[in-house]
């Protein structure tokens, strides 16, 4: 049976990178975290990603080495086609996805896709954006506005206002609940 592709999305500052790093440390033999291939330096930001030049990115895209790819914020992002092998082998795969490209992921993966949307209250999101120090006050206001306006449909919601441990536990609880609902539908 194929695994599930967990498409983790949320506004900038919602804690996706921290959650993914914590999931990598958690003992769970059937869960793999996909790296993103990104056209930005390896040491830019906190995401554990594979840095590519635009030339490298386009070469890989032409060779169909990305299962999914998109362009946002003057940067190219890709999820390697290796996730298809992992899913076929029965592993669940978590990918740092894009809210704006959720429809693309749904189109390609259908019922295998399990979107999880990180939800963070505006005060917590503001605090996180200010603490990381990458954006000025205007950019933070724009990010907060965008976060309030864009809420994907048909997404499991994970509140990420609390501790990282709470979020990891809630992540696995959501997956178990989703699996139980799917099993009930088969009966």
From Swiss-Prot:
GO terms for biological process: 5-phosphoribose 1-diphosphate biosynthetic process; organic phosphonate metabolic process. Keywords: ATP-binding, Nucleotide-binding, Transferase. Its EC number is 2.7.4.23. It catalyses: alpha-D-ribose 1,5-bisphosphate + ATP = 5-phospho-alpha-D-ribose 1-diphosphate + ADP. Pathway: Metabolic intermediate biosynthesis; 5-phospho-alpha-D-ribose 1-diphosphate biosynthesis; 5-phospho-alpha-D-ribose 1-diphosphate from D-ribose 5-phosphate (route II): step 3/3. Coiled coil: none annotated. It comes from the Bacteria. The keyword Transit peptide does not apply. The keyword rRNA-binding does not apply. GO terms for molecular function: ATP binding; ribose 1,5-bisphosphate phosphokinase activity. InterPro entries: GK/Ca_channel_bsu (IPR008145), P-loop_NTPase (IPR027417), PhnN (IPR012699). ATP binds at residues 10-17. Catalyzes the phosphorylation of ribose 1,5-bisphosphate to 5-phospho-D-ribosyl alpha-1-diphosphate (PRPP). Belongs to the ribose 1,5-bisphosphokinase family. NCBIfam families: phosphon_PhnN, PRK10078.1. This is Ribose 1,5-bisphosphate phosphokinase PhnN. The lineage of its organism: Bacteria, Pseudomonadati, Pseudomonadota, Gammaproteobacteria, Enterobacterales. The gene is phnN.
């Amino acid at each position: 049976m194929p695994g599930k592709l967990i498409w983790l999305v949320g506004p900038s500052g919602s804690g996706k990178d921290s959650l993914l790093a914590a999931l990598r440390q958690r003992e769970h033999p059937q869960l793999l975290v996909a790296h993103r291939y990104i056209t930005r330096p390896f040491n830019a930001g906190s995401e554990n990603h594979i840095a590519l030049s635009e030339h490298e990115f386009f070469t890989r895209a032409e060779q169909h080495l990305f299962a999914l790819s998109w362009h946002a914020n003057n940067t190219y992002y890709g999820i390697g086609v290796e996730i298809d092998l992992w899913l076929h082998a029965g592993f669940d795969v978590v990918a740092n996805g894009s809210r704006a490209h959720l429809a693309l992921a749904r189109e390609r993966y259908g019922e295998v896709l399990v979107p999880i949307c990180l939800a963070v209250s505006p005060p917590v999101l503001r605090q996180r954006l200010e603490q990381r120090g990458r954006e000025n006050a205007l950019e933070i206001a724009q990010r907060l506005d965008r976060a309030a306006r864009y809420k994907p449909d048909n997404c499991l919601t994970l509140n990420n206002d609390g501790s990282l441990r709470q979020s990891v536990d809630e992540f696995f609880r959501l997956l178990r609940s989703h699996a139980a609902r799917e099993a009930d539908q088969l009966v």
